[in-house]
Regions:
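Conserved N-terminal Rossmann-fold NAD(P) cofactor-binding segment
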Residues: 2-31, 40-48
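Residue-level recognition of the N-termini of beta-strands and the immediately preceding loop/turn
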Residues: 16-20, 78-79, 103-104, 132
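Structural signal for conserved beta-strand scaffold positions within catalytic alpha/beta enzyme cores
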Residues: 22-24, 107, 134-136
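Short, internal active-site loops enriched in acidic
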Residues: 26-28, 85-89, 139-141
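Redox-cofactor binding/interface segments in oxidoreductases and associated redox assembly factors
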Residues: 34-36, 82
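Rossmann-like NAD(P)(H) cofactor-binding subdomain of soluble oxidoreductases
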Residues: 51-119
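C-terminal substrate-binding/catalytic lobe of Rossmann-fold NAD(P)-dependent dehydrogenases
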Residues: 98-104, 112-186
Length: 186
């Protein structure tokens, strides 16, 4: 119920009327989307040093096992959106266990990492995020990478900007930006 109240408070930012309440698995039957956002709050392993999103796999799958079947059994035929870490592995697990087609089980993957990358680049350059095109690719975790040859600011490739304006951009430490992006949010 507390989570439902928190979400109900947040709907003031939405442009249309939304009703949120505490429910049961059977309520999923008529839902268009179910967001899977489970985490093991007893340990908080990502809060400890030298841990990764993959360290959450065992406790997360343990929780997922108890919810996917009841949701599917309710008659739910919508879309699963997965944000639980490790999101790529958990998304695949839910896809396999639900029996849903691939296009109905979606993980956020590196979409969030890409927006974080744009924010970090904005902070480092002083240029608005809206003018930055950048994508983090691969697994949402330690193996993600940034294809710098495809990053642009105001339509100009960032590698050209660094080369053409060394006094302004030579301090950009691209490997450090990638590492910062990987560790943000954990």
């Amino acid at each position: 119920k507390a989570q439902a109240l928190d979400l109900a408070d947040a709907v003031s930012y939405l442009p249309h009327k939304v009703h949120i309440e505490k429910g049961t698995f059977s309520d999923c039957k008529d839902s268009d989307i179910v967001v899977i956002s489970v985490a093991d709050s007893s340990e908080g392993p990502l809060r400890r040093q030298n841990t990764t999103r993959l360290d959450l796999l065992r406790p997360t799958i343990g929780m997922i096992k108890s919810i996917v079947k009841p949701i599917v059994d309710s008659g739910f035929d919508g879309i699963f959106v997965v944000i639980s870490n490790p999101v790529d592995v958990v998304t695949n697990y839910i896809w396999e266990k639900s029996g849903f087609p691939k296009n109905k089980v979606i993980g956020t993957g590196t979409a969030l990492d890409s927006t974080r990358l744009r924010r970090i680049l904005s902070e480092e350059t002083g240029i608005a995020q809206q003018s930055i095109q950048a994508y983090s690719m691969g697994e949402h975790g330690d193996s993600q990478m940034v294809p710098w040859s495809h990053v642009s600011i105001g339509g100009k490739p960032i590698l050209d900007m660094i080369k053409d304006n060394p006094s302004t951009y030579s301090n950009l430490d691209l490997p450090s930006i990638v590492e910062k992006n990987k560790k943000t949010g954990i």
